[in-house]
């Protein structure tokens, strides 16, 4: 989404996988996907190499003075999606998750870092932590084509008119609606054609989904999955 909005990616851009991404001594593993992949297929098959390329292009965008400035722009988009911040749900102790500011990397690497240094962030690993609520909320943003409502815990709804306006105020992201259609197409393919989400396929219901991996420092990694249906509404 960020790459599309920033103009460094189009749905037709193709990148090779070859079991991962390698550049400047940095290696990121992946499955051996049919190459080259376009965006649609990369989303459906969850190709690490593809999104590593996109992330690097965002940070190295010539409109920014440095990859550090590009990273901070990327981070601002991520925060608009609800990551690295509290969503405001009605439960005490809501976690913010983690999306580091550039100052963190400046301190760790003494200001000597670039896109390759933080490449693991491109696939949601490294210095990234997200709550399940944030992931569900992001699925809602995609389904809504660019906005979300603050999630709340409710007992019941008596009618549309009974809901206070403050609970019906949408929060918009800076990404154009058209770009979400591109992502939804890939998420639909992931479930209904040749992607990683085929177990979620339901006859007669256009389920859209995306798989992920949550790293576990104490044992096996965990699978994650977000989805919504039907895709067109």
Predicted regions and their residues:
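Beta-lactam-recognizing serine transpeptidase/beta-lactamase-like catalytic domain environment
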Residues: 2-233
């Amino acid at each position: 989404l960020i790459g599309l909005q920033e103009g460094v990616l189009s749905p037709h851009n193709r990148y090779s996988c070859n079991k991962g991404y390698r550049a400047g001594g940095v290696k990121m593993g992946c499955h051996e996907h049919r190459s080259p992949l376009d965006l649609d297929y990369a989303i459906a098959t969850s190709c690490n190499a593809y999104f590593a390329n996109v992330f690097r292009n965002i940070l190295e965008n010539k409109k920014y003075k440095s990859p550090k400035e590009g990273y901070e722009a990327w981070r601002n988009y991520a925060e608009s999606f609800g990551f690295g911040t509290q969503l405001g749900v009605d439960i005490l102790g809501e976690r913010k998750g983690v999306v580091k500011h550039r100052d963190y990397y400046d301190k760790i690497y003494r200001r000597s870092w670039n896109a390759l240094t933080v490449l693991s962030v491109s696939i949601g690993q490294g210095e990234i932590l997200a709550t399940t609520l944030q992931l569900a909320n992001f699925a809602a943003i995609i389904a809504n084509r660019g906005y979300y409502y603050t999630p709340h815990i409710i007992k019941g709804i008596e009618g549309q008119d009974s809901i206070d306006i403050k609970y019906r105020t949408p929060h918009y992201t800076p990404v154009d609606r058209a770009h979400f259609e591109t992502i939804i197409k890939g998420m639909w393919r992931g479930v209904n054609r040749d992607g990683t989400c085929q177990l979620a396929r339901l006859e007669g219901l256009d389920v859209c989904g995306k798989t992920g991996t949550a790293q576990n420092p104490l044992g096996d990694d965990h699978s994650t999955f977000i989805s919504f249906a039907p895709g067109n509404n």
